């Protein structure tokens, strides 16, 4: 957003998803090329564009994690903030949003299931998620 001087929603509407995904990939390459020790949370579509998941997995000292939530929990979380998310801004009901989420999770599951660590987060606090990830990394 900073570099483009537009919000993600504006980029999607003005330049399209393909432009956004290409820009996102360029920025991802820059971030992963740095020596910084970071935790990077990507959007759900990031690993599904082109060979981005392969690129992430092939980057030295990178561990991929899939924090899995149920369709119902994702629907609850996303419904009230949907206007800030270009792919779901047009969806008017929780039922339609749930259908959209189911479809996208199915389509994206090939990429998500390539993650080295998979963790169901529905009944976990943020602290518990961090603890579980640290346990899995240590093993």
Predicted regions and their residues:
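NTP-dependent small-molecule kinase module
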Residues: 63, 92-93, 106-139
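ATP-dependent small-molecule kinase phosphotransfer cores
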Residues: 1-55, 84
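Short, flexible helix/strand-to-coil boundary loops that buttress conserved ligand/catalytic motifs
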Residues: 4, 24, 32, 60, ...
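Short acidic active-site motifs
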Residues: 27-30, 51, 100, 107, ...
